[in-house]
Regions:
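Hydrophobic-face positions in mid-chain alpha helices that act as interaction patches
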Residues: 251-386, 419-460, 480, 486, ...
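Inward-facing hydrophobic residues that define packing positions of alpha-helical scaffold repeats
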Residues: 121-124, 203, 210, 254, ...
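Membrane-proximal, proline-rich intrinsically disordered regions
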Residues: 34-83, 321-322, 326, 495-548
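Aromatic-residue-lined binding/catalytic grooves and analogous aromatic/hydrophobic interfacial grooves
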Residues: 35-36, 231-270, 531-547
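Conserved, well-structured interaction surfaces
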Residues: 93-166, 197, 212-218, 373-380, ...
């Protein structure tokens, strides 16, 4: 079988990224990236898939090299506007923060993520199509593992596209909600498939691929954490079924991921407290492939490391001290005054107000060392055990297993915070019922850690046990996933309203500018203009901005 592509630059770019990532692991940010040998193996316009090794190389490039984290994080309630006097922004960031249709293109733009994911899907499809002709070259078990990885790559890319470019999945509305094209053949072109299937159809295809892949996927890779392994696949299944509102399956796959001793699988926050307390050291450790908590690591052309690092870059929209002290990391929490093992870092100066965890590294690959030009890079965990644990807690709450959910919440809390407190359903309910809801003031701009929840599934009345425990889950998961974009999907799933406001020079909310309500059309990122030009139906948009 032959790969034919009119965009060979994407193949070369992806090959360079993988080679760079492996060099990063081996040389610990030496930046002396040696990828010429790998690139020499790439063709100028076509590649014959005639061996199992060809398929393995294909699948290395079936993971997205662009990310949606930056767009998702800045569309969420994890950032505030620091005013028109702050010059550290761009038209792209302005569009993202205010939920406008994004016309600008860069490595983190929806257009690049869309194109990259569909390229990954085409690659996975080509691998699947090639395997049947290679049965005489290897064992059945190796072919099965390759098939499992290809199916997972195809399912994952579609899942990420659907969650960014569509409304949140609900079994009550999915049949009538626009999805994205599910590509099952390597030669397909999106322009040939302008009609968007329902979101229900897309999720059914994702589930089909996921269920077929789960018993097949293996761990026989040179660097396993950069590929789907069984644990990473279970974490994917857990998140998928959580978003599908299939709570028993979400809990089941989380348990398979975490094993019999979840505490041993979580991030080593206590060890990080003993490390050199620099951004470089801590962020490199955060994405360490030897950590049990990191299940699938992906490389990306991305500015996430500099945007959420100790820099002024794009600081007009920021997770600043007001958000941290009232809604997220530094706010009054159920554990009281107990400190984090590895806390946040605050930077405050003219046009700079950031409170951040040191997570994703800021890496730079020089294309021209003399001119000082090149690419922003980062490495990030697409799935972690810590997220899986909190996902299981949510599923257990929805199943009415409140004691087990409280046990999971305790595990997460005691791992990140220096406390011996053991949470119970009653302690959780009492704490969250003692907090006012966010935006309860006359101007609708002041913050607390508790927001009104408006999901389509039943969570009981406000103040009841189920609602209070979900407040705890969402509170903990918001801290856990800060700076990774995942909070945006909780906002969509739970119909959480977001108020856009301007923070004044005193660091307090002053001016209301916009509000995003449940099912606002802007919750679905607009289909990229190239796809719309080819005939793909755009997402609807509101006719006016609503006042609170």
């Amino acid at each position: 079988m032959i790969i034919k592509t009119t965009d060979i630059g994407r193949w070369i770019k992806k090959g360079r990224m993988i080679a760079w990532a492996l060099s990063f692991i081996a040389y610990h940010l030496s930046f002396s990236v040696a990828c010429d040998d790998y690139l020499d193996e790439l063709p100028d316009n076509r590649m014959e898939v005639t061996s199992v090794e060809n398929v393995k190389k294909l699948l290395v490039t079936a993971y997205p090299g662009n990310e949606s984290m930056l767009v998702a994080e800045f569309m969420s309630d994890n950032v505030d506007d620091y005013g028109s006097d702050n010059p550290n922004t761009s038209r792209f960031m302005d569009q993202v923060y205010y939920w406008r249709d994004i016309t600008e293109t860069n490595n983190s733009s929806p257009e690049n993520f869309w194109e990259d994911c569909y390229q990954c899907i085409a690659t996975a499809n080509l691998a699947l199509e090639s395997l049947d002709g290679l049965k005489d070259q290897t064992t059945d078990s190796e072919l099965a593992e390759l098939r499992g990885e290809a199916l997972l790559c195809r399912a994952y890319a579609h899942f990420m596209l659907a969650n960014l470019f569509c409304q949140a999945y609900s079994p009550l509305t999915a049949a009538a909600t626009k999805g994205i094209v599910y590509m099952e053949h390597s030669a397909e072109e999106l322009s040939y498939n302008p009609d968007r299937p329902s979101l229900a159809d897309v999720y059914a295809h994702i589930e089909r691929d996921l269920l077929e892949a789960l018993p097949l996927v293996g761990s026989n890779y040179s660097v396993a954490k950069y590929h789907f392994t069984p644990r990473a696949a279970y974490a994917f299944a857990c998140r998928f079924y959580l978003y599908c509102e299939q709570w028993e399956k979400a809990a089941q796959y989380a348990s398979l991921c975490l094993g019999a001793s979840p505490e041993t699988m979580l991030r080593d926050w206590s060890y990080m407290a003993t490390m050199t307390q620099t951004f470089a050291a801590l962020s490199q450790h955060y994405i360490d492939a030897t950590l049990n908590s990191n299940l699938l690591l992906l490389t990306a052309y991305s500015a996430m490391g500099i945007v959420f690092g100790p820099y002024r870059y794009m600081s007009k929209y920021s997770h600043g001290q007001y958000l941290a002290r009232h809604e997220t990391s530094e706010a009054p929490h159920i554990w009281g005054s107990a400190p984090y093992y590895q806390g946040t870092h605050t930077y405050s100066a003219t046009n700079l107000d950031k409170t951040i965890f040191f997570k994703l590294p800021y890496l730079f690959e020089y294309a021209d060392p003399v001119a000082g030009t090149g690419y922003y890079r980062t490495v990030y965990p697409a799935f972690t055990t810590d997220e899986a644990l909190l996902n299981r807690a949510e599923a257990r709450v929805m199943l009415g297993d409140y004691d087990e959910a409280a046990a999971d919440l305790t595990r997460w809390m005691q791992n990140i915070v220096q406390t011996s407190l053991v949470l119970t359903p009653q302690i959780i309910q009492d704490f969250y019922n003692g907090i006012d809801y966010c935006y309860s003031d006359d101007k609708h701009i002041l913050s607390t850690v508790k927001k009104h929840l408006n999901p389509r599934f039943n969570i009981g009345e406000e103040g009841e046990l189920k609602e209070a425990m979900l407040q705890c889950v969402l509170d903990f998961r918001r801290i856990e996933t800060l700076q990774t974009g995942l909070r945006w999907y909780d906002v969509k799933r739970y119909g959480i309203e977001i108020v856009r406001r301007v923070i004044n020079a005193a660091g307090e909310p002053e001016t209301f500018t916009d509000i995003l309500r449940r099912d606002d059309p802007r919750c679905a990122v607009q289909i990229p203009i190239k796809a719309r030009t080819a005939g793909v139906e755009p997402n609807p948009r509101p006719t006016s901005i609503e006042n609170p």
